[in-house]
């Protein structure tokens, strides 16, 4: 992989992992539409590490408080809003993990296609717009219940279909449940931590088993660029979210979906 591909793919991963526009779609499309070579397992691991480091850094205080209170409750301490949020993240993660494990081969064989990406980009983009318009936006993140987390978790499992957008569908579900934009986005980002960790770990195991060669210079560059892009994306997205809402991302998804439909027609 040349340096242009390294820079482009790392920045794409970092930006699209947390914006409601689908990282998987943007990583699949360069190979399918532009003929770029597959980035390989090692590079996949590298950009996942960069994205994971970015979201943990961006939410380091919240993550530290959640872990502290969750561990304390497990040892017999009192329940707190942070410990309950920890349980909510666990419950919200389970559906995607279980369904992904059961249907991985089906998804890889039948759903990683440009037409599927075009349809899901359009469909779930419109659903995001509807949720943003119709959601009551009354509940703060402290109002997250295990029932809400489970519903959002099943919505997150839909993001196994390329083009759906993990952040997009979880924010959509949270908005429809009445959460504020900030609460919906923050819970979506917290949910990303165990999933990115799991995905990166699985790819790491696959990399070790495959015996694939590692170009360390490329991996370090990919990790750093993915980290910087993801961290900036998270900070800017949260800062602008209440002002701009979801409409800019919906418009982008509609344009992208239409372009893809024309391309594959």
From Swiss-Prot:
Keywords (A to Z) from UniProt: Antibiotic resistance, Cell inner membrane, Cell membrane, Cell shape, Cell wall biogenesis/degradation, Hydrolase, Membrane, Peptidoglycan synthesis, Transmembrane, Transmembrane helix
Entry GO MF terms: undecaprenyl-diphosphatase activity
GO biological process, one term: cell wall organization
Keyword rRNA-binding: no
Top EC class for this record: hydrolase
Transmembrane domains' residue ranges: 1-21, 40-60, 87-107, 113-133, 151-173, 188-208, 214-234, 244-264
Catalytic activity: di-trans,octa-cis-undecaprenyl diphosphate + H2O = di-trans,octa-cis-undecaprenyl phosphate + phosphate + H(+)
Cell location: Cell inner membrane
Membrane topology classification: Multi-pass membrane protein
Principal location listed in the UniProt entry: membrane
Purpose: Catalyzes the dephosphorylation of undecaprenyl diphosphate (UPP). Confers resistance to bacitracin.
Family named by the database record: Belongs to the UppP family.
Descriptive protein name: Undecaprenyl-diphosphatase
Organism: Chromohalobacter salexigens (strain ATCC BAA-138 / DSM 3043 / CIP 106854 / NCIMB 13768 / 1H11)
Source organism phylogeny: Bacteria, Pseudomonadati, Pseudomonadota, Gammaproteobacteria, Oceanospirillales
Gene: uppP
